[in-house]
A protein has these predicted regions:
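N-terminal signal-anchor transmembrane segment
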Residues: 1-8, 14-123, 163-167, 453-455, ...
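Alpha-helical transmembrane segments of multi-pass inner-membrane proteins
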Residues: 1-10, 27-38, 65-67, 112-115, ...
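Transmembrane alpha-helices of multi-pass inner-membrane enzymes
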Residues: 2-11, 33, 113-117, 443-456, ...
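Interfacial loop-to-transmembrane-helix boundary motif in multi-pass membrane proteins
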Residues: 20, 26, 74-81, 138, ...
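Aromatic-anchored transmembrane helix interface
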Residues: 56-58, 108-109, 150, 154-157, ...
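Membrane-interface helix-loop-helix junctions at transmembrane boundaries of multi-pass membrane enzymes
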Residues: 72-80, 118-152, 272-287, 319-328, ...
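Long extracytoplasmic/lumenal interhelical loops at the membrane interface
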Residues: 230, 343-368, 372-376, 380-414
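A conserved mid-to-late transmembrane alpha helix and its immediate loop/hinge
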Residues: 254-256, 293-298, 366-371, 377-380, ...
C-alpha cells in the first residue's frame, strides 16, 4: 500500500523525468497487484487463476489496448487530454470481491496509455528533446510557492492514506480506494501538468465535455420517458416506485454523481459564455447548457443544484465582481425561501428533523453518526476507508453508510491528523485555481468548476476519490503559472475570441 501511494507521491514531487516516470510506473504496477491480493480467494479470481489462458488473454488485451492508445497519443498530441476529460465520468460495473463496483475502466486505459506515451517521449534517447515540462512549471516565486505546496499536500494525502490503512477497520475498502482512485488519479494529475495547455486545446476539451454531457442527458431523457433505468436498477429503482417523482441516473450508478458532472459541464459553458464575443457560439453554448440543465432537474439532486449555483456565482464573481455575485446569491436565497413558503415544501419535508432526514435519504443520521465517530477517535480516526465499517459496528446498521460530507469522512477515518492535511489542501487548491482566473474564460471555467466540485463534496463526499478534482487541479496548476502566450491560431474563432481585448491572454495558453 505504501509502495503504491508512495510511488504516486514521488511522481507528483519529482522534477527528474526518470524518477517521475519510474515512480509512476511502480505505483501503476503495484496498485493492481494490491487488488489481486485483496480478492485472491474470491470465486471470480479463483476461476481466473485456474484458467491461465483466460488470464493471459485478458492481460494481453489490456496491453494491446494501452499500446495502441499510446501510439495514438504520440501521433495526436491533443488526444490524451481531450480523451481523458471525455471519459472522466464513465463508470462500468465490475465484480470485485463478490460485490459490484462501478469503476472508471475507460479512464484507467487512457491514463495507462498516456503514461506510456509521455514516458517514452521523455525518456527515449531520440525523443528526449521532443517533450519537456511546459514553461508553466517555472512560474514566478509567489506562484511557485503555491504550486509547490499543492504538490506537497497532494503527496502527503497519498502517503497518509497508505499509513492509516495499517489500523483501518476496513482494509479492503482502503485498498480499493487507493488502487482504483487515488493512485491512478495522482498519475493523471502528473500527466496533465505535462501538457502544454493552449486555448485551442482547452476549447477542444470543452467541446468534448459538452458532447459527452449531451449523450448522458439523452440517456436520462429516455429513462424518464420509459420510467425505467438502464444501470443500477436496485435501490434507486425501488425508491422511484415509492415516490411520485422519478429520478434518472443515465449511465451512472447514482443520480447525484450524474448531477455532479452535469453541473460541472454547465458551469464550464457558463464561463465560456461570460467571456465570449459574438452571438452564434454563445447562443449554441446556452442551448447546450439548457439541455443539460433539464437533465439535471430530472436527477432531483439537491446537492448538485447547490453546487451548480455555487459554480455559477463563482463565474459571476470572476467576470463581473464579487458584489454582483453576492447580489446573485442573495436573490437565489430569497427565491428559494419564497418557494418553500408558497409550496409548503419546507413545512412538509423540512419541518422536523425526522422529515428532513427522510427527505435527504437519511443524511442527518449519517452526519450525526459520523460526528460521533470523530468524537470517539479525534486524533487518528478509525483508519483509511473505514467509515462504513465503523458506522455499522459502532453506530447502527444502515443501507447507506457514507457520511455524504467529505470533511466528516476525513475526520472519522483519519482524525485530526487527516484534517491537518485536508484543510490546507482545500485552501491551497483554491489559491492556485483562483489566482489569475479572472483573466480569461479558461481560468474562470477551471476555477468555477473546482468551486462547484468542492461544494458538492460537502454534501455528497467523494473529493479526492473523484477524478474531476485531480483533473481540474492538473489544468489549474498550469493555468496559474504565467508565461508568454504562444504564437498559434486557435481552433475556432469562437474559442479564440473567448477573452475580450481589455483582458490579457491567459498565462499558460
Amino acid at each position: 500500500m505504501l509502495l503504491a501511494c508512495g510511488g504516486a507521491a514521488v511522481a507528483i514531487l519529482a522534477r527528474d523525468p526518470r524518477l517521475r516516470y519510474g515512480a509512476g510506473a511502480v505505483a501503476l504496477v503495484v496498485s493492481p497487484a494490491l487488488v489481486a491480493g485483496n480478492v485472491w480467494d474470491t470465486a471470480r479470481f479463483v476461476e481466473l487463476r485456474r484458467d491461465p489462458a483466460e488470464l493471459a488473454a485478458l492481460i494481453a488485451a489490456v496491453a494491446v489496448g494501452v499500446a495502441a492508445g499510446a501510439a495514438l497519443f504520440h501521433r495526436v498530441p491533443w488526444g490524451f487530454p481531450v480523451t481523458a476529460f471525455a471519459v472522466l465520468p464513465l463508470r462500468l460495473p465490475v465484480q470485485i470481491g463478490g460485490q459490484t463496483s462501478h469503476l472508471l475502466v475507460p479512464l484507467y486505459l487512457v491514463i495507462a496509455a498516456g503514461f506510456a506515451c509521455f514516458a517514452y517521449q521523455a525518456l527515449a534517447p531520440r525523443q528526449r528533446g521532443a517533450r519537456s515540462r511546459p514553461d508553466g512549471r517555472s512560474p514566478s516565486p509567489g506562484d511557485r510557492s503555491a504550486l509547490t505546496w499543492l504538490e506537497r499536500l497532494l503527496a502527503a494525502t497519498l502517503v497518509l492514506y497508505a499509513i492509516q490503512t495499517a489500523y483501518s477497520a476496513d482494509v479492503s475498502n482502503a485498498i480499493e480506494n487507493a488502487a482504483f482512485f487515488l493512485v491512478p488519479f495522482a498519475v493523471m494529475f502528473v500527466l496533465l501538468t505535462e501538457v502544454s495547455w493552449t486555448r485551442r486545446l482547452l476549447g477542444g476539451v470543452l467541446i468534448a465535455v459538452a458532447g459527452v454531457g449531451l449523450v448522458f442527458a439523452a440517456v436520462g431523457f429516455v429513462e424518464y420517458a420509459a420510467r425505467d433505468l438502464l444501470l443500477s436498477r436496485g435501490e434507486l429503482l425501488q425508491s422511484n416506485q415509492l415516490h411520485l417523482y422519478f429520478r434518472v441516473n443515465s449511465l451512472f450508478y447514482d443520480p447525484n454523481i450524474f448531477g455532479r458532472y452535469l453541473a460541472l459541464a454547465i458551469v464550464a459553458l457558463a464561463a465560456y459564455m461570460g467571456w465570449a464575443r459574438g452571438v452564434g457560439a454563445p447562443v449554441l453554448a446556452g442551448a447546450v447548457a439548457g439541455i443539460l440543465l433539464a437533465a439535471l432537474a430530472l436527477t432531483y439532486s439537491i446537492t448538485s443544484f447547490v453546487a451548480l449555483v455555487a459554480g455559477l456565482l463563482a463565474v459571476v464573481a470572476l467576470r463581473w465582481g464579487l458584489r454582483w455575485a453576492l447580489g446573485g446569491g442573495a436573490a437565489v436565497l430569497a427565491c428559494g425561501a419564497v418557494f418553500l413558503l408558497v409550496s409548503g415544501t419546507g413545512k412538509a419535508d423540512l419541518g422536523s428533523a425526522k422529515n428532513f432526514d427522510t427527505t435527504t435519504s437519511g443524511r442527518v443520521d449519517l452526519v450525526q453518526g459520523g460526528i460521533r465517530l470523530v468524537g470517539d477517535r479525534p486524533v487518528w480516526g478509525w483508519g483509511s476507508g473505514s467509515f462504513g465499517a465503523a458506522f455499522s459496528r459502532h453506530i447502527e446498521r444502515a443501507k447507506t453508510t457514507v457520511s455524504h460530507s467529505e470533511p466528516i469522512t476525513v475526520g472519522a477515518e483519519q482524525g485530526g491528523i487527516g484534517l491537518l492535511v485536508y484543510v490546507p489542501l482545500v485552501v491551497v487548491s483554491l489559491i492556485v485555481v483562483l489566482r489569475g482566473a479572472a483573466r480569461s474564460a479558461e481560468g474562470a471555467a477551471v476555477a468555477s468548476c473546482f468551486v462547484a466540485m468542492l461544494v458538492h463534496s460537502l454534501g455528497y463526499a467523494v473529493w479526492t476519490t473523484d477524478p474531476a478534482t485531480w483533473a481540474l487541479l492538473g489544468v489549474g496548476a498550469i493555468l496559474a503559472a504565467p508565461r508568454a502566450p504562444p504564437d498559434e491560431v486557435p481552433a475556432t474563432h469562437a474559442v479564440a475570441d473567448a477573452t475580450p481585448p481589455p483582458h490579457p491572454r491567459p498565462a499558460a495558453v
